[in-house]
Amino acid sequence: MKVVILNDAAAVARYGADLFIRQIHKKPDSVLGLATGSTPVALYKELILAYREGRVTFKQVSSFNLDEYLGLDAAHPQSYRYFMNEQLFNHIDIDKAHTLVPPGDAADPIAACALYEKAIAQRGGIDVQLLGIGRNGHIGFNEPSSSLMSRTRVKTLTRATIDDNARFFAPDEYQPHLSITMGIGTILESKKVVLLATGENKADAIKATVEGPLTAACPASALQLHEQAVLIIDEAAASKLSDVEFYKHIERENQKLLDRLGY
């Protein structure tokens, strides 16, 4: 697991966006795994800027989103399909037919989960998967106690996640308690995983992910098993790690080696 500690949230977004841009340059028909929530928005703004400046094109790219609320159709303003259209897809040259989000209004959500897994496999798997992290260590909607080998499935949201997301819904508006989410096993099959975290409220989750045991109590700790997992975090999110300067030293030395080798 690679840990990159940067000064602030803006630097985290730029660094993360650069990883995705380099991936697309290397493989124009890349399959991207995308995430919602407040943290990825700044990264998406960087991707939109790069597209407008002619530094990247998404014409051959396809994407799969991590999750969706069960019970919301794509036109609902709080659906993740709506979010992705507003925050990214409407502003770049990606073919929306090649952007998949789990169907929150599926008549048979269990069958829809199996079809989602099949679609990922048919595309050859995900090249780079973007993740955020919840205060309780959840990734996607894989809440604590989720199986570390789980696949795309219907999941019940914890009260903590429901409360965290309540700010996006009006007080009298229906708020889903169920979701469709890629499983942890699905995420781990991605060729590369990029997790973003900013703010002191994510510090406990980051410490558990990086320095804690591998455990279903912190779903993100499963990334310890991934050879190409990159955590990009700001100083605040890193504040509870045991030795921040050591992680910075590791990254500096690794970067020197990569620069010398021309990577």
Curated annotation (Swiss-Prot):
One of its GO terms (biological process) is carbohydrate metabolic process. This is Glucosamine-6-phosphate deaminase. The active site is at residues 67, 136, 138, 143. GO terms for cellular component: cytoplasm. The keyword DNA damage does not apply. HAMAP family: GlcN6P_deamin. Its EC number is 3.5.99.6.
